[in-house]
Amino acid sequence: MSDRLFIFDTTLRDGEQVPGCQLNTVEKIQVAKALEVLGVDVIEAGFPISSPGDFNSVIEISKAVTWPTICALTRAVQKDIDVAVDALKFAKHKRIHTGIGTSDSHIKYKFNSNREEIIERAVAAVKYARRFVDDVEFYAEDAGRTDNEYLARVIEAVIRAGATVVNIPDTTGYCLPSEYGAKIKYLVDHVAGIENAIISTHCHNDLGMATANTMAGILNGARQVEVTINGIGERAGNTALEEIAMIIKSHHEIDIETNINTQKIYPTSRMVSSLMNMPVQANKAIVGRNAFAHSSGIHQDGVLKNVQTYEIIDPHDVGIDDNSIVLTARSGRAALKNRLSILGVTLDQEKLDKVYEEFLKLADRKKDIHDDDILVLAGADRSGNHRIKLEYLQVTSGVGVRSVASLGLNIAGEKFEAAASGNGPVDAAIKALKRIIDRHMTLKEFTIQAISKGSDDVGKVHMQVEYDNQMYYGFGANTDIIAASVEAYIDCINKFTK
């Protein structure tokens, strides 16, 4: 019988630490439900003590999903654990993920402590967490740069204290695969009682080795992997769930299995990309748009004769459907709801009605509606509780003349109008906006992304605005790229005028 590899998804915790990728609670629930359908074993739902938003998200996700274990992150601090316990009170299966830094640099500079004291704090945290839950995971932060002998002492102590999972993070993404694999093997061979806990990997991609290190860990005895959808995460990201799942599925000689329904990988990838406003690079393994594209004549000829000549993965195995349905203005609510369900998106009736209204408006402006358009519609409406909303926008522009824009805003129910000229339509529109919103804001980043193909398709705009020495990220989506730009700017403003 094959060994079981447990999939611990941290998209909603580590993945959400990417600047500009923060989700609201409704969106987090949407992702959590998709992860449940995908088949992940553990969902790390947040760091409850870090913010009221994270605390509430853990509570609501615990209510929304049934069979995955819901995990809450803490430091090795009693107050953190108390808050995590409270946040997990509705979870059917619950886990506390507590830990402390173990490398010499963390011990000396972060904690101003010593090795023995760190072990004492680690043991105390695990014992305290075990008073409330049966499933406690311990992380040895910066284990990648912790010497193996001391790391083994820490891990042995926390297992004796009751840890059920021991997480060995390559926090800085520094380890070579051979080095990381040897570290896991050292723990397997030298930690008394290691058979009483599951060894987990948690690898970062700073040097592009997250997936390789994770596989090295698996091959040397790790039986849980901590991953994110699309490899999203802090700095250069984390190990990508889709890569590990398909490596395990493709290499039968490893004799390990997961619970992942691989046909849900691609829809989940697209949904997370859309909700987090984080495009997937074209050449990304498994889920990039070029992952199964062949431009070389020799490759094309081989694939036409037999796909196995150059394709080691069947696109259908990851949920890529060549015959995806194209919706039109004549498509009804049921067709839209069904397509959203296939894409991993579940909406309540009120939200579905709003999305359907926007769908009909979009269908009037363009002939065919594709999956990416639908995902944008399902994730783009964040204006419900916004204080500032765009009422109208009119722009006059041409070659050799300055652009002129006039717009109207609704600010907490009060109407405002302004006009301005500028060097191009976007510049004019933003200058008009600034005449109403009299704040000193600096546009730091402005990115336009085409969602699908065709001149009438939806465009997404991502903006980064600096205000009062803080960075705010905004998003807009519209078939009119000028309107999308204004929506993105307003989205930024709403972040600091709550």
Each language-model region and where it sits:
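Alpha/beta enzyme core
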Residues: 5-7, 17-42, 55-64, 78-199, ...
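A mid-to-C-terminal "edge-of-domain" accessory segment
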Residues: 4-5, 11, 246-248, 252-419, ...
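Short, small-residue-enriched loops and turns at beta-alpha junctions
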Residues: 14, 18-19, 47-52, 103-105, ...
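Catalytic alpha/beta core domains of metabolic enzymes, predominantly
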Residues: 175, 182-305
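Non-catalytic terminal/interface segments that mediate subunit docking, oligomerization
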Residues: 17, 22, 30-31, 368-472, ...
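Short beta-alpha connecting loops at secondary-structure transitions
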Residues: 67, 169-171, 226-234, 249-258, ...
